[in-house]
Swiss-Prot record:
Source organism per UniProt: Enterobacteria phage f1 (Bacteriophage f1)
Family membership noted in the UniProt record: Belongs to the inovirus G4P protein family.
Entry function: Acts in the assembly and extrusion of the bacteriophage by forming a channel across the host outer membrane. This channel is just large enough to allow a newly synthesized phage particle to pass through. Extrusion is a process of concomitant assembly and secretion and takes place at specific assembly sites where host inner and outer membranes are in close contacts.
Name of the protein: Virion export protein
Lineage top rank: taxon: Viruses
Cleaved signal peptide residues: 1-21
Keywords: Host membrane, Membrane, Signal, Transmembrane, Transmembrane helix, Viral extrusion, Viral release from host cell
Regions that span the bilayer: 317-337
C-alpha cells in the first residue's frame, strides 16, 4: 500500500511539473515558425511585419507559462526584433526607444541564446503603453497612406510605433500611444479624400515634309483658337513647313483633326491612344512587335561550330505613350508625357535588326480640356532598287540597256496631339 502511494505521488509530481514548465529546443528554426509556436502556446493573436525574417536557436529546460511572454520577447530582442502593442501584438524590427531593463528574467533559468547582438546587462521588458487600433480608409488605397501616417505618428512621439495595411479590407493597423491614435482620425480626414481622374486622348501622326494640312475648320473657329505657344490662330500654319511645331489649343481640335487626317493622302495616323488614370498615377499604352535582338554569340572552342550558341533579348518596337498627370485645385493639369514611335528599318547593312526611333518626352501645364501639339521629329528614308531583264541585264556593256536603277527619298515629320480632361470624383 505504501509503495502504491509513493508511485502515485511521483506520478502526480511529474504531471504537475510538466504542466507548469516546458522544455524548448530550437536549432536554426525559422523566426516565423517560432512566432507561430508562441501564438499556439498562448492563444494570442500576432501580426508579423513583412521585414521579419531569419532563424533562431534557443535551448531552455524550464519556462513556466507565466514567464512565456517575457521569454518570447527576450528571444526576439536577441535577434533584433520586438513585440509591441496589446491585442493583436505586432512583431517588428527592434527599436531601443521606450524600453526598460531588469537584471534577470523571473523564474526561468538554464537558457541559452545563440546571438552575440543581444544587449548585455539583463533582459528586456517592454512598456505596454502602446495601443493597436484599425482605421477604415474610404477613398484611397490604405497602403498608399502608410508613409504619411508613419510621418504623422513619428512627428508627434518618440516612442515605438508601427503602421501596417490590410489590403483585402483596405484597413490601416496602427500601433502607437493612445493620445496619438485619438488624434489620428482628424488627420486621416485631410488625406483620405476622393481622387480626380485624368482622361488623356492622343493622336500620333506623320505628314510628308512640306505638305500642309487644311485644319481651318478645326482650329479657325472661335472655339479652336491657339491658347499659347505660337502666334497663329490656325492649326494649318502650325503644321506647315513655314509654321512652328508646338502649341496649346482650346476647343475640339483633336476630334476634328482625326477627320482631316483621314481625308489627306499625304498624312498617316499611327495611333489614337486613350488613357484614363488617377491623378498622380502613371498610365501607359503601347502597340507593336516584340522583336528579338542578338546580345551575344559564341562560336569558339566552348561551343559546337556546327551549332553556335547565341543569346537573344526581346524588346518592344512600335507605338507607345506614357503619361503621369496631376490635377491641380485650380483646374490646371501638370502632365509628364513620353511618346515613342519606333519601327523596323529595311536596311540590310548591319548583321542584326535595325530600328528607327522617334520619341518625345516633356512636362507641360495645361488647362482642363486644352489640346497640346508637339512635333518636329523628321525621318529620312533613302531607298535604291535595281531591276532588269533576266540574263540579258548581266551581259557586259549591252546589259545596261536591259536594266534600270531607281532611287527614292522620303521625308516625313512626326506630330503628337494630346488632350487632357479632368474627370471629377463623385
Amino acid at each position: 500500500m505504501k509503495l502504491l502511494n509513493v508511485i502515485n505521488f511521483v506520478f502526480l509530481m511529474f504531471v504537475s511539473s510538466s504542466s507548469f514548465a516546458q522544455v524548448i529546443e530550437m536549432n536554426n528554426s525559422s523566426l516565423r515558425d517560432f512566432v507561430t509556436w508562441y501564438s499556439k502556446q498562448t492563444g494570442e493573436s500576432v501580426i508579423v511585419s513583412p521585414d521579419v525574417k531569419g532563424t533562431v536557436t534557443v535551448y531552455s529546460s524550464d519556462v513556466k507559462p507565466e514567464n512565456l511572454r517575457d521569454f518570447f520577447i527576450s528571444v526576439l530582442r536577441a535577434n533584433n526584433f520586438d513585440m509591441v502593442g496589446s491585442i493583436p501584438s505586432i512583431i517588428q524590427k527592434y527599436n531601443p526607444n521606450n524600453q526598460d531593463y531588469i537584471d534577470e528574467l523571473p523564474s526561468s533559468d538554464n537558457q541559452e541564446y545563440d546571438d552575440n547582438s543581444a544587449p548585455s546587462g539583463g533582459f528586456f521588458v517592454p512598456q505596454n503603453d502602446n495601443v493597436t487600433q484599425t482605421f477604415k480608409i474610404n477613398n484611397v488605397r490604405a497602403k498608399d497612406l502608410i508613409r504619411v501616417v508613419e510621418l504623422f505618428v513619428k512627428s508627434n512621439t518618440s516612442k515605438s510605433s508601427n503602421v501596417l495595411s490590410v489590403d483585402g479590407s483596405n484597413l490601416l493597423v496602427v500601433s502607437a500611444p493612445k493620445d496619438i491614435l485619438d488624434n489620428l482620425p482628424q488627420f486621416l480626414s485631410t488625406v483620405d479624400l476622393p481622387t480626380d481622374q485624368i482622361l488623356i486622348e492622343g493622336l500620333i501622326f506623320e505628314v510628308q515634309q512640306g505638305d500642309a494640312l487644311d485644319f481651318s475648320f478645326a482650329a479657325g473657329s472661335q472655339r479652336g483658337t491657339v491658347a499659347g505657344g505660337v502666334n497663329t490662330d490656325r492649326l494649318t500654319s502650325v503644321l506647315s513647313s513655314a509654321g512652328g511645331s508646338f502649341g496649346i489649343f482650346n476647343g475640339d481640335v483633336l476630334g476634328l483633326s482625326v477627320r482631316a487626317l483621314k481625308t489627306n493622302s499625304h498624312s498617316k495616323i499611327l495611333s489614337v491612344p486613350r488613357i484614363l488614370t488617377l491623378s498622380g498615377q502613371k498610365g501607359s499604352i503601347s502597340v507593336g512587335q516584340n522583336v528579338p535582338f542578338i546580345t551575344g554569340r559564341v562560336t569558339g572552342e566552348s561551343a559546337n561550330v556546327n551549332n553556335p550558341f547565341q543569346t537573344v533579348e526581346r524588346q518592344n518596337v512600335g507605338i507607345s505613350m506614357s503619361v503621369f498627370p496631376v490635377a491641380m485645385a485650380g483646374g490646371n493639369i501638370v502632365l509628364d508625357i513620353t511618346s515613342k514611335a519606333d519601327s523596323l528599318s529595311s536596311s540590310t547593312q548591319a548583321s542584326d535588326v535595325i530600328t528607327n526611333q522617334r520619341s518625345i518626352a516633356t512636362t507641360v501645364n495645361l488647362r482642363d480640356g486644352q489640346t497640346l501639339l508637339l512635333g518636329g521629329l523628321t525621318d529620312y528614308k533613302n531607298t535604291s532598287q535595281d531591276s532588269g531583264v533576266p540574263f540579258l541585264s548581266k551581259i557586259p556593256l549591252i546589259g545596261l540597256l536591259f536594266s534600270s536603277r531607281s532611287d527614292s527619298n522620303e521625308e516625313s515629320t512626326l506630330y503628337v496631339l494630346v488632350k487632357a480632361t479632368i474627370v471629377r470624383a463623385l
